[in-house]
Amino acid sequence: MIDLDSLEHIGVLGKPHGVQGECNARLTADLSTLFEEEERLFLFFELDALPVPFRLIGYREKTDDITLLRFAGIESKEEMEQYTGVSLFMERRYFDTDSIEFTWEHFIGFTVFDREGCFVGTIDDVDESTLNVLLSITTPEGKELLLPVAEDLLEEIDVPNRKLTMIIPDGLLQL
């Protein structure tokens, strides 16, 4: 039996869109390539603290941060309304591929290590309001640390273990 610990949280279902059972969703992962590659892709709704599989049959982007999803067996706006606000998950095995791109928000809750393997802290928030994206990290001492993040500073992203290994410029941890 699949439990929530074996799944990756990828977003929340929003309100229904239209009359045929589609819904808005804010996702932290871009599933477009995976949706095209997989013959049958299942996403999981968290219902009564249990993961319930639903087959994804429709996927299209509405705006930069809103995706429209359609699931088998949900044929109307009324049927979809009961799932508004439900957390959405998918199997972690899909995250071992290069078919998924993430938003920075997806990394909230990940642990951060420097390139020597020393624990830096846990990501609590992401600030994308500046030119450089900043990770808000709580250190083991309870101190808040803001780290700029760019692809050249990311040494390893381990999604299944929710871990980032970063190249942290000298002196940044002492600020």
Curated annotation (Swiss-Prot):
Coiled coil: none annotated. The keyword S-adenosyl-L-methionine does not apply. Binds ribosomal protein uS19. It is found in: Cytoplasm. This is Ribosome maturation factor RimM. An accessory protein needed during the final step in the assembly of 30S ribosomal subunit, possibly for assembly of the head region. Essential for efficient processing of 16S rRNA. May be needed both before and after RbfA during the maturation of 16S rRNA. It has affinity for free ribosomal 30S subunits but not for 70S ribosomes. GO terms for biological process: ribosomal small subunit biogenesis; rRNA processing. Its main location: cytoplasm. GO terms for cellular component: cytoplasm; ribosome. It holds the Pfam family RimM. Belongs to the RimM family. One of its GO terms (molecular function) is ribosome binding. Residues 99-172 form the PRC barrel domain.
